[in-house]
Design a protein with these regions (language model features):
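N-terminal leader/targeting segments and the immediately adjacent pre-domain N-terminus
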Residues: 21, 123-185, 190, 208-213, ...
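C-terminal motif of bacterial Sec signal peptides marking the signal peptidase cleavage site
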Residues: 13-16
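Structured C-terminal helix/loop/strand segments within mature extracytoplasmic catalytic/sensor domains
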Residues: 401-452
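Active-site SXXK
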Residues: 173, 190-216, 243, 282-286, ...
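Active-site helix/loop module of the DD-peptidase/beta-lactamase fold
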Residues: 210-246, 290-325
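Active-site Gly/Thr loop motif
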Residues: 360-421
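Active-site-proximal alpha-helical segments within enzyme catalytic domains
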Residues: 281-285, 321-342, 410-426
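Short, surface-exposed linear motifs at loops/turns and structural transition points
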Residues: 18-124
Length: 452
């Protein structure tokens, strides 16, 4: 009998004691913590799901976090409403490159219940190199990243075999690899070829954000009529956006000459995708709209702000300008692209335009934005053909990659999910190519071996 009384007392005592309880009425809620998503250097997103209120109303819910295990509401926390169900919590004020432990919580009259613990590591802060040709650029080693050192030499051997002049990998803006081949150096300029189309895309967007032009307006609004040999009604269908998207409807089989006699009507603008150098007319549009030369506007609004010292547009004939720069200058532009138009805290080109530029711009070639190539789409077109190819344009590379591609394998690869920029300059890897080649797939097999 004494044992029964003692046991009853113990059970009564335990039922009245909970480290999170503030009352003896009802039970604690039942809650789970949502997996972490969208982690940056200073923030993350989580949340919770309350499936039972324990018999009394949920008066407070959210997530709490700490650099120690099992955080409680006495640590940092969010407050995200009341009641049952799922909720999302935006966690801010975090420190970069730090491990955090996170739990969802729900408070009712019985106390505070906690969900399972989840962890996240905040990103390293994005680095931007100082301006200047001789500026020191911070590096990060293969070992620091936990990458595969044994995969480096096969990559470099392949690059040299394929007539590469220079190669760089940036992660979070820091140089991981920087290699020069066949007498090329860090100060040697090289041509971008059509990779430079992305410079034109960006500066066109800058001119639009300054109110100088609207890409939805027809090209002739800025440079007058007669810039093509198309009938006037057809010419007036062509907008600046059509030039950005490569769906002007002009004949792409007549070579690089962009004089009016060579810009001939094939289809209405917006109905046919074809890779065409008529995009260069956007430089005339910007010059006319700004009242400056293209070079002056480009240098002031983009080149100088990114510290792309010494880069220059060189007239290659046929009305085309080709950009030349060092490899590091190309990497600077790629780093701005990785940061959606931002450079060291300054928004060079607004993010809305940049997102449009790096997403599908029309419904014909899904792998093309505003003069940017896009990976991971269901199909793609290539220059000089109307064939549709199924699948991702570089299947060995991350699906979220977007690219600036130029003749003879001039490359800027931007991979947001990896916080990575990859640069390749040089002679053609194999036979002369306008943009895509088998080189891309093999190269990305070797790059992926670094981090997989």
């Amino acid at each position: 009998m004494k044992k029964i009384i003692l046991l009853s007392f113990v059970l009564l005592f335990l039922s009245s004691c909970s480290s999170d309880s503030g009352s003896d009425s009802g039970s604690l809620a039942t809650i789970t913590t949502t997996s972490i998503s969208e982690t940056t250097s200073i923030s993350a997103t989580s949340g919770g799901n309350i499936t039972s209120d324990g018999g009394s109303a949920i008066t407070l819910r959210g997530v709490c976090w700490s650099i120690n295990h099992n955080p409680t509401i006495t640590d940092s926390r969010t407050t995200d409403g009341t009641g049952l169900g799922t909720f999302t919590s935006n966690i801010t004020g975090l420190t970069s490159n730090t491990i955090y432990y996170i739990r969802a919580y729900a408070t009712n009259s019985a106390g505070t219940a906690y969900g399972n613990e989840v962890t996240t590591t905040t990103d390293e802060t994005m680095y931007f190199p100082p301006n200047g040709r001789s500026a020191t650029w911070t590096t990060k080693s293969i070992a620091d990243l936990g990458w595969n050192q044994s995969a480096v030499q096969p990559l470099l051997d392949y690059l040299e075999l394929k007539h590469t002049k220079s190669f760089m990998i940036l992660v979070n803006g820091r140089i991981v690899l920087e290699n020069y081949f066949n007498g090329h150096t860090a100060t040697t300029p090289w041509y971008w070829a059509s990779a430079g189309k992305t410079l034109t895309s960006t500066v066109t967007g800058i001119a639009q954000q300054e109110g100088l032009l609207n890409i939805n307006n027809k090209v002739s609004d800025y440079i007058g009529t007669g810039w093509t040999s198309a009938p006037l009604a057809k010419e007036n269908l062509i907008t600046c956006k059509n030039l950005l998207s490569m769906d002007s409807g002009l004949n792409d089989a007549l070579g690089d000459d962009v004089s009016p006699s060579n810009l001939q009507y094939v289809a209405d603008a917006g109905t046919r995708w074809a890779y065409h150098n008529v995009y260069v007319k956007l430089q005339d549009v910007v010059a006319s709209a700004s009242g400056q030369t293209w070079t002056s506007y480009f240098n002031t609004k983009l080149r100088d702000k990114l510290g792309m010292t010494g880069g220059a547009w060189i007239d290659s004939g046929d009305g085309l300008n080709v950009y030349w720069s060092t490899t590091r200058n190309m990497a600077r532009f790629g780093l701005m692209a990785l940061n959606k138009g931002k450079w060291n805290g300054a928004q060079i080109i607004n993010e809305t335009y940049f997102n449009q530029a790096t997403n599908t711009s029309q419904n014909i070639n899904l792998a093309y934005g505003y003069l940017w190539w896009l990976n991971g789409k269901a199909s793609y077109h290539l220059p000089q053909t109307q064939l549709v190819f199924k699948g991702s344009i570089v299947p060995t590379a991350p699906n979220d990659m977007f690219m600036a591609w130029g003749k003879n394998d001039q490359k800027i690869y931007v991979i947001p999910s990896k916080k990575m920029v990859v640069i390749r300059m040089g002679e053609a890897a194999d036979a002369e190519t306008m943009a895509k080649s088998d080189f891309d797939e093999t190269l990305w097999t070797k790059i992926s071996a670094l981090y997989q």
